[in-house]
């Protein structure tokens, strides 16, 4: 009886008639399995063999069994490294924190997989999320005070605090704002809400700057990920969870998923990360907000102090840019 039909699986069966051993292997998008069957007579022969412990080799097995075990439980590590980049203009009506932008989708992954050989494609079961770089660029002149808050969340997670992958607050007064997040985890391609795994929420605070229909900024993002046949295929570099690009650190701050203390005066802020937000570009509906407080809520500042700090940070950035340009 064939335990692993060939349809939709990569299977392998080998048999050693002399030693009465059988190996069954199966690998598809649902995962990997391997079974080793040894007859009772052969098992008795193996049990009579003395196993010894050595410093270099934890277990020393009979050559035949060692070879069979190696063949039974070995598999090829299939890895497809991918980099996806997209750019889109955002209507000011959609920049109020009420919609989300999926940074990686099932449709995109399926398109990637379609380019692989069938025998490799059907083994792919995981996507490993390495890094996300996000650039916001204003579609208006420099110098206008335009604070913006951004959060990258895993919207599959019900807890609004635990879903946070990273959050940042900045200002588009100097035209653009950029930061990078390192999720560094893998998920099954069969997870139900894959499109919600990397959800970008953005809240443009100067909501009266333009009218509905006007494009207020451009979002450009790059996602680095890998498609593999195992959850154990990838080792991640030891980067920070989230970071601001150097030149933008003077006018922004970040919050890691660990909620560490931010060394910045302007660290008390909140962003609505309620679940079930509408997709960017879709019709929105009224919903109850769920503001996540970032930083220490015990200290608050009035509007004048907030603007004064923004102005001070902009001056610091201006001086830094002069130093860079050698002025």
Swiss-Prot record:
GO terms for cellular component: host cell plasmodesma. Its main location: host cell. One of its GO terms (biological process) is transport of virus in host, cell to cell. Transmembrane segments: none annotated. It comes from the Viruses. Keywords: Coiled coil, Host cell junction, Host-virus interaction, Transport, Viral movement protein. It is found in: Host cell junction, Host plasmodesma. Pfam families: MP. Residues 297-327 form a coiled coil. Homotrimer, through the coiled-coil domain. Interacts with VAP. May interact (via N-terminus) with host prenylated Rab acceptor protein 1D (PRA1D). Belongs to the caulimoviridae movement protein family. Transports viral genome to neighboring plant cells directly through plasmosdesmata, without any budding. The movement protein allows efficient cell to cell propagation, by bypassing the host cell wall barrier. Acts by forming tubules structures that increase the size exclusion limit (SEL) of plasmodesmata, thereby allowing viral ribonucleocapsids to spread directly to neighboring cells. This is Movement protein. It comes from Cauliflower mosaic virus (strain Strasbourg) (CaMV).
């Amino acid at each position: 009886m064939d335990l692993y039909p060939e349809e939709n699986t990569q299977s392998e069966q080998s048999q050693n008639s002399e030693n009465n051993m059988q190996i069954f292997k199966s690998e598809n998008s649902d995962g990997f399995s391997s079974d080793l069957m040894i007859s009772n007579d052969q098992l008795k022969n193996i049990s009579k063999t003395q196993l010894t412990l050595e410093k270099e080799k934890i277990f020393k097995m009979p050559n035949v069994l060692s070879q069979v075990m190696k063949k039974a439980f070995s598999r090829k590590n299939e890895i497809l490294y991918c980099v996806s980049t997209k750019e889109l203009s955002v209507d000011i009506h959609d920049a109020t924190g009420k919609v989300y932008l999926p940074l990686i989708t099932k449709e995109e992954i399926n398109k990637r997989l379609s380019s692989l050989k069938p025998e490799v494609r059907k083994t792919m079961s995981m996507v490993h999320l390495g890094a996300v770089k996000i650039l916001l660029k204003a579609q208006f002149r420099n110098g206008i005070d335009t604070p913006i808050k951004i959060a990258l969340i895993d919207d599959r997670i019900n807890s609004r605090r635990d879903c946070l992958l990273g959050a940042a607050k900045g200002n588009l007064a100097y035209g653009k704002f950029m930061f990078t997040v390192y999720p560094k985890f893998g998920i099954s391609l069969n997870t139900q809400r894959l499109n919600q795994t990397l959800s970008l929420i953005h809240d443009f605070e100067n909501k009266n700057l333009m009218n509905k229909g006007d494009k207020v900024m451009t979002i450009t993002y790059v996602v680095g990920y890998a498609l593999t046949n195992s959850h154990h295929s990838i080792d991640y570099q030891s980067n920070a969870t989230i970071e601001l690009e150097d030149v933008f650190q003077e006018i922004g701050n970040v919050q890691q998923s660990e909620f560490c203390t931010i060394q910045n005066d302007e660290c008390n802020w909140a962003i609505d990360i309620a679940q079930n937000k509408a997709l960017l570009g879709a019709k929105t509906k009224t919903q109850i907000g769920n503001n996540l407080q970032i930083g220490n809520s015990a200290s608050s500042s009035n509007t004048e102090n907030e603007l004064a700090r923004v102005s001070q940070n902009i001056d610091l950035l201006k001086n830094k840019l002069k130093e860079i340009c050698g002025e």
